[in-house]
Structure formats: C-alpha cells, structure tokens
Swiss-Prot record:
Sequence intervals crossing the membrane: none
Gene: rpmH
Keyword Ribosomal protein on entry: yes
Domain of life per record: Bacteria
Name of the protein in question: Large ribosomal subunit protein bL34
Keyword entries, A-Z: Ribonucleoprotein, Ribosomal protein
Species the sequence originates in: Yersinia pestis
One GO biological process term: translation
Region (Disordered): 26-46
Basic residues composition-biased segments: 31-40
GO molecular function: structural constituent of ribosome
Length: 46
C-alpha cells in the first residue's frame, strides 16, 4: 500500500509558505499569533 505522505517542497510552500500566509487576512492572523508566541519559525518556508 502506498503511504499517504508523499513530500513535495513546492506543494508544501504553496499551501503553507510565507507568501501563502501573507496572501489572506486569516493567514496574516496566523503569522501574528506565531510572532506573539515568539516562534523561531513562522512558516515552513525560509
């Protein structure tokens, strides 16, 4: 049986990357929450 997780950096960044987060109001809220928590990584990209 094929595993469900087939990693792809491009798909990962397009859905969860910094520019994807910045593109929507809710995405910017996600970044704001992560900044407030002082997360070392805001998004999977970078």
């Amino acid at each position: 049986m094929k595993r469900t997780f087939q990693p792809s950096v491009l798909k990962r960044n397009r859905s969860h990357g910094f520019r994807a987060r910045m593109a929507t109001k809710n995405g910017r809220q996600v970044l704001a929450r992560r900044r407030a928590k002082s997360r070392s990584r805001l998004t999977v990209s970078k």
